[in-house]
């Protein structure tokens, strides 16, 4: 006879923060009868989801990668941003053997060094201070041909802030006496993560083939893009005139034998452009003449299956994460999300492990193929909900980890009306799932990984596309709900789930259960 399981669900509403300022808050502006009923009827509290509480520098906004890593680990995980920043500040980064390998290759063979990544201080994918540390290291090594390929942000920082970062970089390079900007690309092109290779090809062609519009300076390129109505994220890849090294074939593009350091530390949006450059079997688009003998260093491990790369900061191993622990106990678990957040409920939630554990099923629902999600604010939430309800009714799973992407992905567009529609779609979905869970005598911990749709305008009334620093909710939805302790953070979620499931918390999890008993 098949065992029927009482499901415990962790529902992660990506980008759903708490903010009392209703004027800037798409969640507060939306019509949400189900959320209203949930917050009225069930015990709830708030969790810290940014800064030191999630292993980031104080005042640094949280993000999906960091959030899911902390949630799944059940402990505060020292984030790559903090780890690399500390080494950059102390000078320890100068001793990094993989970074030295890239620089020594360029120096010893008369080749160029290319530094490539997101140019901002957003701290989600990269940080400009890391780029400066690499330039300083190149100077100390005696390099003379260093090219920077700037991916413009406009998402984790204001939409038209790139000039500030370009000026900061150019001033730094002038003072250092080394480095020049070779290409400029909006992250929409250079940092796709959804196999939209028509976008990636435009960035690749500029960086490798130097096939793109040519401008005298990065400032002129940016001004021209703004005149066309492009914001930083969407700047079409272009080339910038360089003082080509004497006798070099390179005008700033990647050539055979060159060294490349990709200084993004977050993996998901660094994978496609990296594969396009290093993988001989890449077939996403026609690359033209493939570059050979590239010394390519990734700041962190983007994907264990990417060939021909070194890793400057290898992954820290996390043992006894939530998924690993309940798998070892023989329990059945489901991870489900649409494409945009699938890596977060699998790879990041499992502490950087790609493979599913025994008893761990995964469902990927494709995200809609639209250029920006304000065009379809419900995204694939209804399809995800159908599959989640089926999974609950199947009684197969002890635990379901679910992510809804809407509040984050539509929040990133900066379009208030679309974000409101996204929340209203979510409200319908959460209502359906709550009903199904209660019918199955299950329970939900409803929470979020960070804020976004809760703060759509900044203090000056400008559109805000970045994550917020606001706390996130935690609600226990059950037939007999339990009170929750205050003062928690994301790393307390795994211990709380285990507590609700009646399972001992492993010693590796230093977070604490927020469930009040008695």
Q: Where on the chain are the PLM-derived regions?
A:
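Feature captures the catalytic ectodomains and active-site-proximal regions of enzymes
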Residues: 1-518
């Amino acid at each position: 006879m098949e065992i029927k399981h009482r499901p415990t669900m962790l529902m992660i509403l990506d980008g759903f923060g708490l903010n009392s300022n209703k004027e800037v808050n798409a969640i507060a502006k939306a019509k949400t009868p189900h959320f209203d009923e949930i917050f009225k009827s069930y015990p709830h509290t708030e969790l810290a989801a940014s800064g030191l509480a999630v292993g980031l520098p104080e005042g640094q906004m949280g993000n999906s990668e960091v959030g899911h890593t902390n949630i799944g680990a059940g402990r505060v995980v020292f984030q790559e941003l903090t780890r690399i920043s500390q080494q950059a500040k102390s000078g320890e980064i100068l001793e990094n053997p993989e970074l030295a390998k890239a620089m020594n290759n360029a120096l010893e063979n008369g080749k160029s060094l290319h530094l490539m990544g997101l140019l901002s201080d957003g701290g989600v994918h990269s940080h400009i201070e890391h780029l400066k540390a690499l330039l300083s290291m190149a100077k100390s090594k005696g390099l003379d041909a260093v090219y920077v390929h700037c991916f413009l942000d406009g998402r984790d920082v204001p939409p038209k802030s790139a000039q500030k970062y370009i000026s900061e970089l150019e001033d730094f390079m002038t003072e250092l006496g080394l480095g020049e900007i070779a290409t400029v690309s909006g992250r929409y092109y250079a940092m796709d993560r959804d196999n939209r290779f028509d976008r990636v090809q435009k960035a690749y062609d500029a960086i490798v083939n130097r096939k793109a519009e040519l401008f005298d300076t990065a400032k002129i390129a940016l001004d021209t893009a703004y005149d066309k109505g492009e914001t930083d994220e969407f700047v079409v890849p272009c080339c910038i005139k360089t003082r080509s090294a004497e006798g070099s074939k390179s005008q700033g593009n990647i050539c055979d034998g060159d060294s490349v350091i990709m200084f993004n530390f977050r993996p998901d949006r660094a994978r496609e452009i990296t594969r396009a450059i290093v993988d001989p079997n890449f077939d996403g688009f026609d690359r033209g003449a493939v570059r050979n003998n590239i010394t390519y260093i990734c700041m962190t491990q983007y994907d264990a299956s990417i060939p021909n790369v070194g890793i400057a900061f290898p992954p820290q191993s996390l043992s006894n994460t939530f998924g690993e622990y309940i798998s070892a106990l023989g329990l059945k678990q489901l991870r489900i999300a649409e494409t945009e957040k699938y890596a977060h409920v699998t790879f990041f939630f499992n502490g950087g492990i790609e493979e599913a554990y025994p008893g761990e099923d995964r469902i990927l629902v494709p995200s809609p193929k639209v250029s920006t999600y304000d065009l379809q604010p419900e995204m694939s939430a209804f399809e995800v909900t159908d599959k989640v309800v089926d999974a609950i009714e199947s009684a197969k799973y002890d635990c379901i980890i679910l992510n809804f992407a809407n509040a984050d992905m539509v929040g990133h567009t900066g379009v208030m009306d679309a974000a409101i529609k996204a929340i209203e779609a979510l409200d319908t979905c959460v209502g359906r799932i709550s009903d199904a869970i209660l019918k199955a005598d299950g329970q939900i911990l409803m929470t979020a990984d960070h804020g976004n749709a809760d703060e759509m305008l900044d203090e000056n009334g400008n559109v805000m596309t970045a994550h917020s620093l606001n706390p996130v909710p935690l609600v226990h939805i059950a037939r007999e709900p339990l009170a929750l302790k205050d003062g928690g953070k994301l790393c307390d979620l795994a211990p709380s789930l285990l507590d609700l499931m009646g399972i001992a918390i492993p010693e590796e999890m230093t977070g604490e259960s927020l469930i009040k008993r008695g």
